[in-house]
Amino acid sequence: METSALKQQEQPAATKIRNLPWVEKYRPQTLNDLISHQDILSTIQKFINEDRLPHLLLYGPPGTGKTSTILACAKQLYKDKEFGSMVLELNASDDRGIDIIRGPILSFASTRTIFKKGFKLVILDEADAMTQDAQNALRRVIEKFTENTRFCLICNYLSKIIPALQSRCTRFRFGPLTPELMVPRLEHVVEEEKVDISEDGMKALVTLSSGDMRRALNILQSTNMAFGKVTEETVYTCTGHPLKSDIANILDWMLNQDFTTAYRNITELKTLKGLALHDILTEIHLFVHRVDFPSSVRIHLLTKMADIEYRLSVGTNEKIQLSSLIAAFQVTRDLIVAEA
């Protein structure tokens, strides 16, 4: 009877792990599991070993290991049974105002632990989403309760954190992961999950993720579930990103066809494949850098493309911006012909 009861308990746990998103299933559990930023990790490890952990400010692009690093530190500092009472993890973008500081953070930081020596840990993810007033209130809380609480702020943009908070923390920048570091970890996941992946599929994953491990794993999982095979084409289709052949066609139409034909063809392709003009613009921008255009032509194109990207970001009509992009390339064509 006891054996069958144990089996019943194990089955839901196994199912729960199996159903986890891969970003959580393969999240590093210790500092040694992390694949990058060894200089930062060794410094933090030294702080922990010497029991001198300062307030931390971890910043950098998404998916580079900031949250995983501090959670691994917390697991090293506290046993499982005391984790809940010693660590407060909050996402500042859920509640960005001053109430989050005066409420849960203040009450957690101000209460001392009876049974355990050492400090509590407050992890504030997406701290750059906090309002100015909330950040000023947090500064005062940090000053007041440094004796028994350590704060770790995590953000993407350091410039959005007030100088008074920055000066009270030890800052570490987490840069994008290199392909050399990402590929072995992705291969490990592929092996564990028995994913059918081609070489060009792996390259496409690394290219589209741009050093963001979380994005790479999400694309890998969704492509595998949607298509059963991960190739360059399925990866690009799953993310709605234009293929190289699509970009080649778009450029050919813009430079060699008249305006009306180019506009019609590109609109049909966008509708057929569900492409966003922003993604097309990003790929064309890379093409402009690769091709040996005369300087005046390149400057003209990049200026026009920068204007179009800005207008797209503030929510203007995509059809008008597509017309503007085609017009910019047709003017470029005339400039090249005139200079020849």
Curated annotation (Swiss-Prot):
UniProt GO MF annotations: ATP binding; ATP hydrolysis activity; DNA binding; enzyme binding
Cited SUPFAM superfamilies: P-loop containing nucleoside triphosphate hydrolases, post-AAA+ oligomerization domain-like
Key words of the record: Acetylation, ATP-binding, DNA replication, Nucleotide-binding, Nucleus
Stored CDD domains: AAA, HLD_clamp_RFC
N-acetylmethionine found at: 1
InterPro entries associated with the record: AAA+_ATPase, ATPase_AAA_core, DNA_pol3_clamp-load_cplx_C, DNA_Rep/Repair_Clamp_Loader, P-loop_NTPase, Rep_factorC_C, RFC_lid
GO terms under biological process: DNA repair; DNA replication; DNA-templated DNA replication; positive regulation of DNA-directed DNA polymerase activity
CC annotations in GO: Ctf18 RFC-like complex; DNA replication factor C complex; nucleoplasm; nucleus
Record bears the keyword Transmembrane: no
Domain of life: Eukaryota
Function: Subunit of the replication factor C (RFC) complex which acts during elongation of primed DNA templates by DNA polymerases delta and epsilon, and is necessary for ATP-dependent loading of proliferating cell nuclear antigen (PCNA) onto primed DNA.
Subunit field text: Subunit of the RFC complex, an heteropentameric complex consisting of a large subunit RFC1 and four small subunits RFC2, RFC3, RFC4 and RFC5; the RFC complex interacts with PCNA. Forms an heterotetrameric complex with RFC2, RFC3 and RFC4; this complex has ATPase activity but is not stimulated by PCNA. The heterotetramer of subunits RFC2, RFC3, RFC4 and RFC5 interacts with RAD17.
Full protein name: Replication factor C subunit 5
Gene name of this polypeptide: RFC5
